[in-house]
Amino acid sequence: GTAGTYFPLGGAIADILNKNVPGANASAQSTGASVANINLLQQDKVDIAFVQNDIAYYAVNGSEMFKDKKVPSIQGLATLYPETIQIVTLDKSGIKSLNDVKGKRVAVGAAGSGTEANARQILEAYGITYDDIKVQYLSFAEASNALKDGNVDVAFVTAGHPTAAIQDIATQNHVVLLPVDSDKADALIAKYPFYTKLTIAAKTYPNQEADVQAIAVRAMLAVTDKMDADTGYAITKAIFSNLDRLKAAHSVANAVSKATALDGMSVPVNPG
């Protein structure tokens, strides 16, 4: 859809390519989320797509929502910025750590979504399975209402931070973000190469007095192996030479840099 971060950034990238890459005829298309975008790449309906690096990994490896539907042709141009896995509870729940969630009502994301896979993998790192919790398959819009109404105890959301929906809950409630401890994060990164560590700085949300250690997946630009190296190079060079245009389109682009463009690269890189 047009409400997220991909659409304004896609428009900016199309603009950059049309001005800097000879013969480019780029336009931004409003699509579904990462899974839909992988399918569009596979069907040759688009040449470049924004996807989360975890979804790209599942596609190339034929796992999770791509079980029995492997898409080996997917390649990466660059990873762009983090999509933080935020684990939200309210102060009154008394939950201070993921070790405390056994027996609790946990919203893990919509069934079959990237968020749901993130939640399952993180809980697994803590030795917790869905049998140990009361699992609720809710989108974050549904989960935020359920948190406010006291119908769930903890909710997972994967989104660049600060996330508007969490800010919204925090206006009326004392929100607490649960950390992913460093040793657990290291174990997750060793097993799933799409994860990276990051810190949600103190004061990102109201009442948040301390930094919170988190892990993130990364938004990336994906193509297929049909894109030749020269084109891949020209596109990547144009984008990284015009980052100011991206930053003007959306604040998440402040995190985009050449230095981190291979962080969390979970699929083969286009030779360009």
Regions found by a protein language model. Name each.
Residues T84-I95, Y192, A214-T231:
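A bilobed periplasmic-binding-protein/Venus flytrap-type ligand-binding module shared by bacterial periplasmic
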Residues G1-N25, P82-D149, D244, V267-G272:
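Bilobed "Venus flytrap"/periplasmic-binding protein-like clamshell domains
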Residues D15-A36, Q43-K45, L123, G150, ...:
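N-terminal secretory/targeting leader peptides
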Residues V21-G23, A33-A36, Q43, V71-P72, ...:
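Extracytoplasmic
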Residues K67-L80, T204-Q213:
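A structural signal for short loop-to-beta-strand junctions that line the ligand-binding cleft
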Residues Q42-V51, K104-V106, D149-V157, Q172-V176:
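Alpha-to-beta junction loops
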Residues L138, E142, D149, A159-P179, ...:
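An extracytoplasmic/periplasmic, membrane-proximal ligand-sensing/linker region
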Residues G11-D15, S27-D68, I95, A141-A146, ...:
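Pocket-flanking alpha-helical
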